Amino acid sequence: TAAAIAYGLYQKNDNTRFLVFDLGGGTFDVSILELFDDILEVRAVAGDNYLGGEDFTNLIVEEFYKEHGLTEESLSLKEKSYYRNQAEKSKCNATEDGFYRMQAAVNGEKVETLIPRGAFEKMSSQLLDRIKTPVRKSLSDAGVKAREIDEVVLVGGTTKMPLVRKFVGKLFGRVPDTSINPDEAVALGAAIQAAMKERKEAVKEVILTDVCPFTLGTEVSVKTENDHLEGNHFCPIIERNTVIPASRTQHFFTVYDHQTQVEIHILQGESRFASNNVSLGTLKLTVPDNEAGKEQI
């Protein structure tokens, strides 16, 4: 929502749909918003917590290692950090002719690796394919098609890459809005949102709604066909894309006789197995001593 505010989406025409494409250094998020009657509503969100600019940097590092006969195992932490920094510079400063030029010293000798634009696009194909999954998921959750999106805005430093901008343009069949520095969009939007909360006259007031980006729930034990208890199951309580703030109630029961303590393991994620989701923390509650299933929380 902060990025959407920074781009002034709340000042657009009613019944307009937007997609915020946020690709940072280590994570990727996509949000679909709709504006109507001065209400900017987040319709759906999706993302990949393990996809970002660092993955593109890794491709350049790997190509440099391959070309100059280096391996991770043969390098010190200082050397690996040095090569990553040089690769990051190469990624951020692609030449006008489309080359990614990484220059660095190997055994005291200055060498370079040149990666043509076409070759880098091919190297990045799997990463770009991973971008499509959250985009499709968010469109499906919002019940809209790509052609029904009126405007696409870019957020996050990695969207500065010509490769990414070209890919987004092809994906939606339109040139994305890059009028604001993607590194500053969220901070700028947060400042405007703060002004709205303070009811500053210079800022148009708009109602903002947001959604829960991941399903929230807890780990539970369930009975198997053999009447045995099996742990590691995830019980959703607040589903992904629920408008927030929100509250839900779910009842749970003790699982064995004379149980006096219950540990609530809170997680976020979409897997039915607790171990595949992200742990947010635990709560320990004391319950009365009783038979299994007699006490509930």
Sequence positions of predicted segments:
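Oxyanion-binding/catalytic loops of NTP- or PPi-dependent enzymes
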Residues: 1-297
